[in-house]
């Protein structure tokens, strides 16, 4: 099975024939913070849970968060949920204690990443 979670899936943070090259994605409906919650509930050792996720594309240590998102995952998932469910930016900003401009920028970034990576979420095309 694949390891791509909803946060990564919506924003295209996976490789189609890498971690996305699988017949089943059992985590694709869960945001990243939910995967961490389930891991703790299942008793996964903390060393594994707290290991920094990495795209493994640089020789220097860099986390997925630093490389792709620039937003802490806890906040990212709340923003992503609001974007996905079309919660107004003003409401999202008020609930999360953020400036509305910051929420608008995040939503614009999500939209751009989602559009730019749409091909990753579709089946490969045939010749006919």
Question: What annotation goes with each model-predicted range?
Answer:
Residues 2-128:
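ATP/NTP-dependent adenylation/nucleotidyl-transfer catalytic domains that generate, transfer
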């Amino acid at each position: 099975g694949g390891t791509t979670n909803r946060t990564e899936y919506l924003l295209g943070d996976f490789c189609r024939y890498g971690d996305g090259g699988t017949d089943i994605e059992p985590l694709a409906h869960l945001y990243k913070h939910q995967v961490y919650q389930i891991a703790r509930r299942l008793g996964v050792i903390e060393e594994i849970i707290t290991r920094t996720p990495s795209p493994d594309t640089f020789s220097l240590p860099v986390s997925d968060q630093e490389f792709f998102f620039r937003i802490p995952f806890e906040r990212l998932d709340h923003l992503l949920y609001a974007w996905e469910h079309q919660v107004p930016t003003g409401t999202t900003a008020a609930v999360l204690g953020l400036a509305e401009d910051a929420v608008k920028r995040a939503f614009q970034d999500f939209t751009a990443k989602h559009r730019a990576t749409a091909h990753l979420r579709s089946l490969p095309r045939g010749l006919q």
